[in-house]
UniProtKB/Swiss-Prot annotation:
Taxonomic placement: Eukaryota, Metazoa, Chordata, Craniata, Vertebrata
Region annotation (Linker) ranges: 171-223
Keywords: 2Fe-2S, 4Fe-4S, Apoptosis, Cytoplasm, Iron, Iron-sulfur, Metal-binding, Mitochondrion, Nucleus
Entry protein name: Anamorsin-A
Subcellular location: Cytoplasm; Nucleus; Mitochondrion intermembrane space
Organism: Salmo salar (Atlantic salmon)
Residues annotated as binding [4Fe-4S] cluster: C275, C278, C286, C289
Binding-site residues, [2Fe-2S] cluster: C236, C247, C250, C252
Record motif Cx2C motif 2, residues: 286-289
Region (Fe-S binding site B): 275-289
Annotated function: Component of the cytosolic iron-sulfur (Fe-S) protein assembly (CIA) machinery required for the maturation of extramitochondrial Fe-S proteins. Part of an electron transfer chain functioning in an early step of cytosolic Fe-S biogenesis, facilitating the de novo assembly of a [4Fe-4S] cluster on the scaffold complex NUBP1-NUBP2. Electrons are transferred to CIAPIN1 from NADPH via the FAD- and FMN-containing protein NDOR1.
Stored InterPro entries: Anamorsin, Anamorsin_N_metazoan, CIAPIN1, SAM-dependent_MTases_sf
Superkingdom to which the source organism belongs: Eukaryota
Domain remark text: The twin Cx2C motifs are involved in the recognition by the mitochondrial CHCHD4/MIA40-GFER/ERV1 disulfide relay system. The formation of 2 disulfide bonds in the Cx2C motifs through dithiol/disulfide exchange reactions effectively traps the protein in the mitochondrial intermembrane space.
N-terminal SAM-like domain: annotated segments: 6-170
């Protein structure tokens, strides 16, 4: 136990579990008592009664669990959380537990044990050592948990509690005073760099470069506005041999022209009359109405009148 680092004046909680030899447990407790001296204290607690004992929070410098070679224990998440609660800030937890090399529901791997220790609020979790279980411990473990694998070993883990209490808070100091910003010294502007950005094509003194004047690329005809007829393709809307038809993506105006002609062709001249009620029937027609005797018709319907009906007597 000398390699644990327990020193005089420390308060140690020794957690044991079944099966444990009373002689071995007493010997370990006496050895720890000699290390802590009269100023320290060594308390013994059975793991099954650890939570029910309600130890004071942050009251132990050390929690040593299942370190007896003739016993074993699987630490639950509740047990680990209780151990973390009773440890002082910066206190240590050292435990031993059987682990397996493959994932199993009854015995966890060393990686999952490390994860469980971290989830309980402990930090600096390290694997100190790993050794095979004794045949007696393997038999007892299989009887206790029902585990039937053969990849069992005993691992010792060390962890620490952070140097603050779980759930503790501290006030953050903020300065809300108006801060005067110091003037930032801008780098000096390099005249040559500025000149490089202001160069134009005319400033380049290079006889090997033949520059083209963009204004000389256009002549007077290029500035004339074209008429609609010149924009049409040679065969666009040629009605001499076939019906006029605009291109799919017509942009010369023929499509709009044909659309207007189509609308005009569909317009049907309405029957003209003085009263405007001739289409309703004889009950609404005048005595001299040319539609007398004809059935009612729809507005806009083309009606052909007999020549006799238009003769005046």
């Amino acid at each position: 136990m000398a390699d644990l680092g327990v020193k005089a004046g420390d308060k140690v909680l020794l957690v044991w579990s079944q099966p444990s030899s009373p002689t071995t447990l007493k010997k370990l407790a006496e050895s720890l008592g000699a290390m802590v001296g009269t100023d320290g204290r060594v308390s013994l607690e059975n793991m099954e009664r650890l939570i029910m004992s309600s130890h004071a929070a942050s009251s132990y410098d050390w929690v040593l669990s299942s370190l007896l070679s003739d016993s074993f224990s699987v630490h639950t998440s509740e047990t680990l959380a209780e151990m973390a609660r009773v440890i002082k800030p910066d206190g240590k937890l050292v435990l031993e537990e059987p682990v397996t090399g493959t994932d199993d529901q009854k015995v966890r791997t060393a990686e999952k044990l490390i994860s469980a220790l971290k989830l309980s609020g402990l930090v600096s979790v390290t694997e100190v050592s790993k050794e095979p279980l004794t045949p007696e411990a393997v038999s007892a473990l299989k009887t206790f948990t029902g585990f039937q694998g053969n990849t069992l070993s005993r691992v010792r883990m060390s962890a620490s509690k952070p140097n603050f209490e779980v759930g503790s808070s501290s006030q953050l100091k903020f300065s809300f005073g108006k801060k005067t910003s110091k003037p930032v010294d801008k780098p000096a502007l390099d005249p040559n760099a500025a000149k490089a950005w202001t160069l134009s094509a005319n400033d380049m003194d290079d006889d090997d470069v033949d520059l083209v004047d963009s204004d000389a690329l256009l002549d007077a005809d290029d500035f004339k506005k074209p008429d609609a007829a010149s924009l049409k393709a040679p065969s666009c809307g040629d009605g001499t041999t076939k019906k006029k038809k605009a291109c799919k993506n017509c942009s010369c105006g023929l499509a709009e022209e044909l659309e207007q002609e189509s609308k005009g062709a569909k317009t049907i001249s309405q029957p003209k009359s003085a009263c405007g009620s001739c289409y309703l029937g004889d009950a609404f027609r005048c005595a001299s109405c040319p539609y007398i005797g004809m059935p009612a018709f729809k507005p806009g319907e083309k009606i052909v009148l007999a020549n006799t009906g238009l003769n005046d007597t």
